[in-house]
Amino acid sequence: MAKIDNAVLPEGSLVLVTGANGFVASHVVEQLLEHGYKVRGTARSASKLANLQKRWDAKYPGRFETAVVEDMLKQGAYDEVIKGAAGVAHIASVVSFSNKYDEVVTPAIGGTLNALRAAAATPSVKRFVLTSSTVSALIPKPNVEGIYLDEKSWNLESIDKAKTLPESDPQKSLWVYAASKTEAELAAWKFMDENKPHFTLNAVLPNYTIGTIFDPETQSGSTSGWMMSLFNGEVSPALALMPPQYYVSAVDIGLLHLGCLVLPQIERRRVYGTAGTFDWNTVLATFRKLYPSKTFPADFPDQGQDLSKFDTAPSLEILKSLGRPGWRSIEESIKDLVGSETA
């Protein structure tokens, strides 16, 4: 573990992590605890964090505490739980994959603004990290060349499609999810520009995240949960609807959040979590290579390739500053996933 020089948040500082029971959030918590920080994690009920609380009590005694926020849209929802925090990682969002705009986009925006308002009213907060997604920049378009995505890229198309596509369209829920991430992040930057609070905002934009599932009871519906289902021979029709795209290790996503919270040179940045491209046949080929004695489903029909390119210079700077030479490979990420589920 690399020592963090001139950290914005001194070691031992308290960080509030919203939606801490989620797959990505649990990896953010893990990296914060591993690097000497204290974490207050929220969930809609204490039971949703019970297994993770036991894990972290055993591994990092006295450094993680559970806080219940039943409704992130309620006025003042975070006002009490944020007290004493030096940093905030707002990860809680709507992941129902409903195709109804008002059920997904509206609460995503409202929850984000609620957390920002609470931070603005809390003098101890120095950094705020919003978990966005690469879909706030673009939904992957297979076999299309010349797409380059940087910190100025926004998926404005998703907002229109989320509002206008018929509910019978099988891709509608994906566009609604993308709109929720796009609009919530845009609302966050607008809040910062208009209110000029005392803290710094950074955003982390992960793509398909693969890694250890810390709590199978609550995280089976995550991206890694879907991949594990394929490992176990279940071919969900939903997988065929997911285009080729980028993957990223959950470890690296945890580190990117950590860097956005504590590294002084990372300010007002949109940081992509895009290690490399994959499709389901890449995953199946990796399964067969790593676990040759196991039988896996047949390959999917050719889905093409994601030919887009992302500006990952800020991401790689963070990883290097935290002692990592670069991205974890898809093989390492899949080993992390399968090992956690078969141990």
UniProtKB/Swiss-Prot annotation:
Its EC number is 1.1.1.2. The keyword NADP applies. Changing residue 22 to A: Results in loss of substrate inhibition and of NADPH-dependent reductase activity. NADP(+) binds at residue 177. GO terms for molecular function: alcohol dehydrogenase (NADP+) activity. InterPro entries: Epimerase_deHydtase, NAD(P)-bd_dom_sf, NAD(P)_dehydrat-like. Keywords: NADP, Oxidoreductase. It comes from the Eukaryota. It catalyses: a primary alcohol + NADP(+) = an aldehyde + NADPH + H(+). This is Aldehyde reductase 2. Transmembrane segments: none annotated. Belongs to the NAD(P)-dependent epimerase/dehydratase family. Dihydroflavonol-4-reductase subfamily. Pfam families: Epimerase. Optimum pH is 5.5. Monomer. Inhibited by quercetin and diphenylhydantoin. Optimum temperature is 40 degrees Celsius. SUPFAM superfamilies: NAD(P)-binding Rossmann-fold domains.
